[in-house]
């Protein structure tokens, strides 16, 4: 092989080797792109999971899904119907909350469309101030969209002093529109259920707050 052929061979070898050196750079770029896409998907999924909680709560309140009751601003304008329905009251306390919680009446009968006030009694059985929030629903779940609360202790957090007992009212009515919903044909009883969950410990008050200073003995 003469010098000219050797030069051509060397040039050809170099040209063939060049793409081989560039390949790793293309691979790294492709991996970085895939990694970036995966990271973006993870971030979007995390964001969606947080957004799903308030959206789910709003959806339940708006539709009565999963037995979530509705919030009414006023009594119905029409007169109550002749049809009557039973309403049962259930009370529960989550673990770790030292409260006694029970309805004054476990069951009543009301006219559909009638505004009714009932009471639950709550006692803080501990020696410290505690706070809790009540979660609620009704069964059967199909009745949630028609159980309208005008006022309820469950709308806000409740703070109870040590040993305090309190009556907590619920003002509600069953929407007459329930009679047009065939899913609730033959419905005779609705159960309203509450469960109190601890929120956090209230800031303890100093034992000697408001008391006059006491003389100290000699050291």
Swiss-Prot record:
Where are the bilayer-spanning segments? 30-52
Q: Where in the cell is it found?
A: Cell inner membrane
Q: What would be one Gene Ontology cellular-component term for the protein?
A: plasma membrane
Q: Name one Pfam family in it.
A: CtaG_Cox11
Q: Any ranges marked Cytoplasmic in the topology annotation, and which? A: 1-29
**Stretches of the chain found on the membrane's Periplasmic side:** 53-219
Q: Give the way it sits in the membrane.
A: Single-pass type II membrane protein
Low complexity: which segments have biased composition?
A: 14-24
Compositional bias (Polar residues): 1-13
Query: Disulphide bridges in this chain?
Result: none
Kindly state a single biological-process term from the GO annotations of this entry: respiratory chain complex IV assembly
Q: Which GO terms describe its molecular function?
A: copper ion binding
The reply to whether Ubl conjugation figures as a keyword in the UniProt entry is: no
Positions of the UniProt region annotated as Disordered: 1-24
Q: What is its main location?
A: membrane
- Extent of the signal sequence: none
Top-level division of the source organism's lineage: Bacteria
List keywords of the entry alphabetically: Cell inner membrane, Cell membrane, Copper, Membrane, Signal-anchor, Transmembrane, Transmembrane helix
Instruction: Identify the PANTHER family for this entry.
Output: CYTOCHROME C OXIDASE ASSEMBLY PROTEIN COX11, MITOCHONDRIAL-RELATED, CYTOCHROME C OXIDASE ASSEMBLY PROTEIN COX11-RELATED
| Role | Exerts its effect at some terminal stage of cytochrome c oxidase synthesis, probably by being involved in the insertion of the copper B into subunit I.
Q: Please state which protein family the record places this protein in.
A: Belongs to the COX11/CtaG family.
Q: What is this protein called?
A: Cytochrome c oxidase assembly protein CtaG
**What species does this protein belong to?**
Bradyrhizobium sp. (strain ORS 278)
């Amino acid at each position: 092989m003469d010098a000219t052929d050797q030069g051509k061979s060397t040039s050809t070898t170099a040209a063939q080797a060049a793409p081989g050196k560039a390949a790793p750079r293309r691979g790294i770029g492709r991996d970085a792109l895939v990694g970036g896409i995966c990271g973006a998907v993870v971030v979007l999924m995390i964001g969606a999971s947080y957004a799903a909680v308030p959206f789910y709560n709003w959806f339940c309140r708006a539709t009565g899904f999963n037995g979530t009751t509705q919030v009414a601003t006023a009594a119905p304008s029409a007169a109550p119907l002749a049809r009557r329905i039973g309403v049962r009251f259930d009370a529960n306390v989550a673990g770790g909350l030292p409260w006694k919680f029970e309805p004054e009446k476990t069951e009543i009968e009301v006219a559909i469309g009638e505004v009714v006030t009932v009471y639950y009694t709550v006692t803080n059985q501990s020696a410290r101030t505690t706070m809790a929030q009540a979660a609620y629903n009704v069964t059967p779940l199909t009745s949630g969209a028609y159980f309208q609360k005008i006022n309820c202790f469950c709308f806000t957090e409740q703070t109870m002093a040590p040993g305090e007992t309190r009556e907590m009212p619920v003002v509600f009515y069953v929407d007459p529109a329930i009679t047009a919903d065939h899913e609730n044909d033959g419905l005779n009883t609705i159960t309203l259920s509450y469960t109190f969950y601890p929120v956090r410990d209230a800031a303890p008050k100093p034992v000697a707050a408001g008391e006059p200073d006491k003389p100290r003995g000699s050291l």
